[in-house]
Amino acid sequence: MPPREDWIEQATKRAHEKKSHVSFPQLKYPSLRDDFLKDPIRWLKGKALDDGAEGLWRVHDKLYDFTTFMKKHPGGEEWLELTKGTDITEAFEAHHINPTTEKMLNKFYIRDAKTPRNSPFTFKEDGFYRTLKRAVYEELKNIPKDVSRTADRITDGIFMTLLCSSTLACYVEQFRVIWYVVASVSLALLTVACHNYIHRRTNWRMYLFNLSMWSYRDFRVSHVLSHHLYTNTLMDAEISFLEPFLYYNPRTDKPLHGRLGFITEFLWFPLFFLMSFVKRSETPDWGEHQVEALLDRKDINTNSFAVLTLFGDHALHHMFPTLDHSVLKYLHPVFLELCRKYQANYRVSTQFEIVVGQIRETMRTSFKTIDVK
């Protein structure tokens, strides 16, 4: 049997058995993933069952106790509170660009972990991501210190527009519908803009996210700690939470309503996530995985307002989520240079093409493969 057909047969079998990942067969199927009642806290519980952190915090193959450090954590106590008992390797790597941070871990070292990491991703010193992170750290020194004020002004402006339009919608008789529309659009834009602040240290703007009736704390789990770190894998909560209504993972036994997900999504979920599954290494560099799993939009990345309110500069944002969106455009040259050097599969598209693409993903039942030379 040709290698491609053989792999597809094995992948289909793994998908049906649900004992391991399809693309990463060395990993067990995520605990609690298919429970009918799903929420961020349950996702954390399932992760704790699989990570071998023994009630502590795991970074790579070592266990640490940050209990005495929690209140002193520069990013806020909440991050450590949420992740206790889990493997935080990806979160630690992505959220700490300064190389001196890793040296501080020695103060809290307890012992080596007893089990291998339940993650396929690597962070080798000469790999794509760590090389990029070192280059970004140096590049940040050349970026104006006040550049993030642009995002602050945009966010504050949208917030004030929401307050004014909401007040007028309730107060005036004429043009009330117009003010309703302005308030609704402002709330939608503000919700996305606040996403910029949820990734970072505790700050007042992240609480504005709650005006959407979503919880910023839950979003920190499902989006920041799950989707950002395990993008488009079985461990991605933003994939598993949509099931059994939407199925982005390909499977031959996908139910009819799953194949008609482009209809379901307009009824159940307002945000679109493009999924791209290609055959890759079973232990990929984390940064290269992010580049492969995401598409940037050339019609969005050229405008600071659009970048902030429409999830722009998505590839760089996924790899350096704590950086303000206004900073990311300065990192394009070094990012593209290293993508070429490491032959990372960086791709750009348009907003329209991505909307069409994510609809096609909900309808797909077969695996995508590529020829490996």
PLM features per residue range, with description:
Residues M1-N142:
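B-type heme-binding environments
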Residues I41-L44, T67, R176-I178, W204-L208, ...:
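Intrinsically disordered, low-complexity segments enriched in polar/charged residues with Gly/Pro
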Residues V182-D371:
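Membrane-embedded catalytic scaffold of the fatty acid hydroxylase/desaturase
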